[in-house]
Every structure is written in C-alpha cells, then in structure tokens.
C-alpha cells in the first residue's frame, strides 16, 4: 500500500503545481446514448454521442451517430475543471455549428462511474445527469 500512498501524494503535489488538467481519470473514450420519439414507420430516434477526452492537451472531440436527428456541435472542445466537474467548451464556429451555450457538456465522476449533462440532450430532463460509459476501443 505504500506505493499507492506515494503515488497519491505525488499526484496531489503534481496537480497543485500544474494549471493544466492532469487528472487522467478524464482521459479516454466515452459514449452516451439517447432514444427519442417513435416515428410513424415504427423506428425510433436514436442518438449516440462519442467523446474522446485528451486532458494532457486540454481538448476533447465529439462525434455522433444518429438516426432521424440533426447533428450539431460535433468537433473540438476545450476543457476546464470547475469544482470537480469537467466542463467542455465548443471550439468551432458557435453560431452555425452549435446553437447551445457554453459549456455544452459537463461531466462528473464518482468512483468508476461517469455522468454527463448538457442542453443538447433533448430527450432527458433539463439538468439531468445521464450515465456516461467509458469504452475501450478495439
């Protein structure tokens, strides 16, 4: 257990001396899915948001897979940590590409569980934290 303790102390010192986000717990590929309304042909609106977070370079990128829904706000984001919550700010041409106010997404982390909220999630309650899956890309 000493090594872990040492690692923890070291990482605390490290983050105190560094203004960039060094919390690698945020790094990786994440996915959240939303199901929307049922359409006349029996199919259902489906949205899958894929986030790749690279905290060392202070950036994230969003790609989407969707059926029957418009795609907005895809592309690059910059990161800020605000009282333990990771906020994502869209870097693109806001007006045309992303109609939602910054930060577009907020991510919180409790243990191994991740949650995300954002105005883009139109099929959830406003301000609702949705489960965010950390995925391992093959």
Predicted regions: what they are:
Residues 19-31, 53-55, 134:
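N-terminal helix-cap/turn-to-beta initiation motif at the start of protein domains
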Residues 31-36, 61-67, 88-94, 117-119:
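Short beta-strand segments that buttress and anchor functional surface loops
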Residues 69-87, 111-138:
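Edge beta-strand at a domain terminus
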Residues 22-45, 77, 86, 116-118:
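Tryptophan-anchored aromatic micro-motifs
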Residues 87-107:
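An anionic, turn-rich surface loop/hairpin at beta-sheet edges
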Residues 2-10:
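Sec-dependent signal peptide recognition
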Residues 15-17:
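N-terminal signal peptide c-region/cleavage motif recognized by signal peptidases
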Residues 41-81:
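N-terminal glycine/threonine-rich, aromatic-flanked beta-hairpin/loop signature
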């Amino acid at each position: 257990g000493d090594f872990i303790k040492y690692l923890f102390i070291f990482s605390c010192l490290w983050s105190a001396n560094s203004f960039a986000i060094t919390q690698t717990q945020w790094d990786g590929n994440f996915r959240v899915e939303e199901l929307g309304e049922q359409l006349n042909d029996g199919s259902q609106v489906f949205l899958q948001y894929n986030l790749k977070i690279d905290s060392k370079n202070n950036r994230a990128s969003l790609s989407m897979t969707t059926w029957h829904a418009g795609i907005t706000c895809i592309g690059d984001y910059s990161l800020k940590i605000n009282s333990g919550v990771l906020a994502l700010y869209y870097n693109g041409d806001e007006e045309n590409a992303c109609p939602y106010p910054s930060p577009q997404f907020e991510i919180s982390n409790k243990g191994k569980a991740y949650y995300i909220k954002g105005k883009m999630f139109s099929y959830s309650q406003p301000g609702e934290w949705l489960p965010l899956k950390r995925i391992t890309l093959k």
